[in-house]
Amino acid sequence: MVVNKQGSVKSIKRKARKSKKVVSGRAKEFTYKGYSLEDLQKMSMEELIKILPARARRTLLREPNYEQKKLMEKLESDEEDVKTHVRDVIILPNYVGKIVEVYNGNSYFKFEIKPEMIGHYLGEFVMTRKEVKHSGPGVGATRSSKFMPLK
């Protein structure tokens, strides 16, 4: 029986996945449509709008409302934690590294803005609905459940 010296098929696939993330021993550098993070941060708003997807482009071309303007000013300032209810603000390169707390309807969800989030809305990273976890039937749900002891 011939034994593969490299290992099983799973281990080979695992090594291939890992090699995509790391380029010759160093972490893969972030780029957005061919631009590095430093290039994106140096760009003017007009240049940045041209490379964003259509939905983000349309949102930024419109005049932001009062709450959006206020949040954008806070994100561009040196404040550490920014709490907000506004979920429809596009993440720009200037906001990378900031810690934001976004309201999900029940509580604030805290996260750090990473370069991969550029061009997305803040609300995309905060779930508003909880996953449903079903348990046993309640009292009166079935005929036999009438005789189940109450907790």
Swiss-Prot record:
It comes from Thermoplasma acidophilum (strain ATCC 25905 / DSM 1728 / JCM 9062 / NBRC 15155 / AMRC-C165). The keyword Glycoprotein does not apply. Protein S19 forms a complex with S13 that binds strongly to the 16S ribosomal RNA. PROSITE patterns: RIBOSOMAL_S19. GO terms for cellular component: cytosolic small ribosomal subunit. GO terms for molecular function: rRNA binding; structural constituent of ribosome. Belongs to the universal ribosomal protein uS19 family. GO terms for biological process: ribosomal small subunit assembly; translation. NCBIfam families: PRK04038.1, uS19_arch. The keyword Ribosomal protein applies. Keywords: Ribonucleoprotein, Ribosomal protein, RNA-binding, rRNA-binding. It holds the Pfam family Ribosomal_S19. This is Small ribosomal subunit protein uS19. InterPro entries: Ribosomal_uS19 (IPR002222), Ribosomal_uS19_CS (IPR020934), Ribosomal_uS19_euk/arc (IPR005713), Ribosomal_uS19_SF (IPR023575).
